[in-house]
Design a protein with these regions (language model features):
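Generic recognition of cysteine residues
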Residues: 8, 96, 107, 151-153, ...
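Generic structural "secondary-structure junction" signal
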Residues: 56, 103-106, 155-157
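Active-site environment of non-heme Fe oxygenases that use a 2-His-1-carboxylate facial triad
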Residues: 69-71, 76-133
C-alpha cells in the first residue's frame, strides 16, 4: 500500500514477513489477483476529488498501475519501480525508487513508447541506483531518457515528495 498526500508527503507499507527467501523482484511479492484503487482527495478537507478502480489483470503491481491510468484516466502512462533488497531480514527493503511518465494530449505515441522502453535502460538505472538525491536529480533522469530525442519534455514544477510516516515504530514493524 502506498499513500501520497496533496502536500507530497508519502509513505508506503510492505509486510517484511511476506518477503520470502530469494525474492529479488517487486512482482514476486504480489499475488495473481487484485484490484488497483486510486483516490485523489483534497488535503485540508479530506474531500474525495476523484477515485477509480480497475482489475489487476497483468499480475505486476507496476504494470497494473500503469494499466489503471490508461483505462481509468485515459492517459498513456509509463512506470518504473526499482527495489533494492538488503540481506538483513529485519529491514529487507533497502531503497525503492519510482518514475512515472504520462503522455500529454497530442503526444507522439511512438516517441512515448520509446521513452517507456528507456525507463530501465542502464544509463537511467545507474542514476537511480546511485542514490544521489539533489536538486539536479530529476533533470539528470529526464536528460538520460531524452538526450537524443527531438521532443519537448517538462518536469512538473511541484514540491519534491518527502517520505514521512506518522506511524509509531512498533506499529510499523508489527
Amino acid at each position: 500500500m502506498a499513500d501520497i498526500g496533496a502536500d507530497c508527503d508519502l509513505r508506503a507499507l510492505i509486510n517484511p514477513a511476506s518477503i520470502g527467501e530469494g525474492v529479488e523482484s517487486l512482482d514476486k511479492l504480489f499475488g495473481e489477483a487484485g484490484t488497483v484503487a486510486v483516490t485523489k482527495s483534497d488535503q485540508p478537507t479530506g474531500r474525495v476529488l476523484a477515485s477509480g478502480t480497475s482489475e489487476a489483470v497483468l499480475h505486476d503491481v507496476v504494470e497494473d498501475l500503469a494499466h489503471h491510468f490508461a483505462v481509468s484516466d485515459q492517459l498513456e502512462t509509463a512506470l518504473a519501480v526499482l527495489v533494492q533488497f538488503a540481506p538483513d531480514p529485519a529491514r529487507p527493503v533497502r531503497q525503492c525508487y519510482g518514475i512515472m511518465l504520462q503522455a500529454m494530449p497530442d503526444c507522439d505515441l511512438e516517441q512515448f513508447d520509446d521513452l517507456r522502453k528507456r525507463l530501465l535502460a542502464p544509463e537511467v538505472r545507474s542514476i537511480l541506483e546511485a542514490g544521489e538525491r539533489d536538486e539536479d536529480f530529476a533533470s539528470e533522469v529526464l536528460n538520460a531518457l531524452t538526450h537524443d530525442l527531438d521532443c519537448s519534455c517538462q518536469l512538473y514544477p511541484g514540491p519534491a515528495p518527502v517520505y514521512r510516516c506518522g506511524c509509531s515504530h512498533d506499529s510499523s514493524v508489527a
